[in-house]
Amino acid sequence: MSHTSRRLLCVVAVSAATLCAAAQDDGGNKISVTGSVQSDIIIPQEDKAINARDYDEWALTNTYADVALTSKYIDAGARFEFVKFPLPTFYDEDGFKGWGVPNIYVKAHFKSWDLTLGNFYEQFGSGFILRTYEERTLGIDNSLLGGRLVVRPVKGVTVKALAGKQRRFWDLNKSWVSGADVELNLDQWFKGMADKGTYLTLGASWVNKYEKEDDIMVGGTHKLNMPSTVNAFDVRANFQKGGFNILAEYAWKGEDPAQGNALTGRDYSYIYHPGNVAMLSATYSKKGLSVLLQAKRSDAMSFKSKRNETSGIASAINHLPAFTMDQTYALAALYPYATQPDGEWAYQAELAYRFKRNTALGGKYGMNVKVNFSHVHSIDRRDHAGNEFDGTAKGTDGYGSAFFKWGDEMYYQDFNIQIEKRLSRSFNLNLMYMNQFYNQTIVEGEGGMVHSDIFIADAKYRINRKLTLRGELQYLSTDEDDGDWLYGLLELSFLPHWMFTISDMYNSGVTNQHYYQGLVTFSHGSHRLQLGYGRTREGWNCAGGVCRRVPSSKGVTLSYNYNF
């Protein structure tokens, strides 16, 4: 961690201690202490059959401990992290290893304003131009270290202003990120709207990145004029009436030449192409029925606080949500889609319906059915002429794009149908079918289109008040990549403390390898301890459209979670 960041953290720590002491002495105001501990450990073993490597350390761990102090007017908190010998997923990530207290903050909150100093997380709108958050399963913590002011000057109006430097593992990026957001809740101004169940929220945001120029050469002789300031803007409107809700949002980002990816066979690194994203999302819900319709177009919306960032999980200022169904079953999540910020058209539709009890389809206990469809396509791109020095796109605007026109490639598509049915007082059955097209070249860099059909059965039988048995059977059929997969799981729960799980994922298409797991879980109050042994397949772990590569591994695992 740099000297500047250490000094900032020291100032915040002293401020937190002083303000909390003042709050404690102010009229007997009580201070509440909450926190959590999370520790995930593996004792790795080499397994050449699945390319599970050996490590210099006998054990690897990601361990976190959070503590937060809250009072009537002052809050403060800190997080300790020990990832000096991190889990295999993060072991080779440049800059990830370390230990210390990288996150500390103090917050003053009153009726009409809040002030935060230190590390903080924030999101403007849907996150198109600003979203800082923590996702430990991916190793993401892109918090800002600085200050944030939230003001509520009048009823229905919220104004935010912030500035800081972004965390990159155990350091801070050199650029400054600043921004402002205003949100108007018109229903709080007009009493008649709320009385009729009508709500309208309008929002606008601005984000600025200031980053000193880098020496980027073209053809070995020409230096690009890199913009030190990049601005981004966002406007949005959210309307709600009864069970109907519609959100429209548009964001624009200025020219931000940066390290890029090769798309359509051409490298678009360091092009001067402004970005934009437009989204329309509509939902309707009432008892027993919900409908979702979404469309989104994005173009050149990668926005990072480090121009030459090579990590796929670090330095992101913004976030583009995925328009695909979140999958929790092992084989349904085998080929997850990663949002492509360089450009995509994305659509999603979902219908969920509950058949009532004592009807022909609902039966004695009723039945839930959910149908989901997602489609992601490339945007139109017409490459412009290259520069005069080496013929590449560097230093040019790269390409033109007609807004409503598709490109030539499908990136992803899936169709899901899920049925949840209670067959008796003690037996529940969930069935799922998924048809998927996954462009492996776009997401992973090579492999072509993978078309798969996935079948899943999930059954739960309640033996008695304390004993429950659950089982899963899954089958993935495909002629591409590694071919067919089979998966089985048995889980026995003894309330209130114990759970025993065994599972196996088997590739019957190419490798004929088994990825077996055995787990014993003990829970008591706020404590949860899990001991396991087995293999983990190499693949991708995704959350919210952000993905990272997971290496294969084998060994003894131990996880502990505690909340207080």
Task: Describe each model-derived feature in a short phrase.
Residues 1-34, 564:
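Bacterial Sec-dependent N-terminal signal peptides
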Residues 24-33, 69-76, 108-112, 116, ...:
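Short loop/turn motifs that connect adjacent beta-strands in outer-membrane beta-barrel proteins
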Residues 26-53, 374-376:
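Short glycine/proline- and aromatic-enriched beta-strand/turn motifs that initiate or cap beta-hairpins
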Residues 38, 193-197, 226-564:
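Exposed, low-structure sequence patches enriched in small/polar residues
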Residues 41-60, 398-404:
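Surface-exposed strand-loop-strand hairpins of Gram-negative outer-membrane beta-barrel proteins
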Residues 55-57, 61-70, 77:
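Long, low-hydrophobicity, solvent-exposed regions enriched in small/turn-prone and acidic residues
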Residues 68-165, 192-194, 282-308, 482:
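Outer membrane beta-barrel
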Residues 140-221, 228-233:
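Hydrophobic, small-residue-rich alpha-helical packing segments that form membrane-like cores
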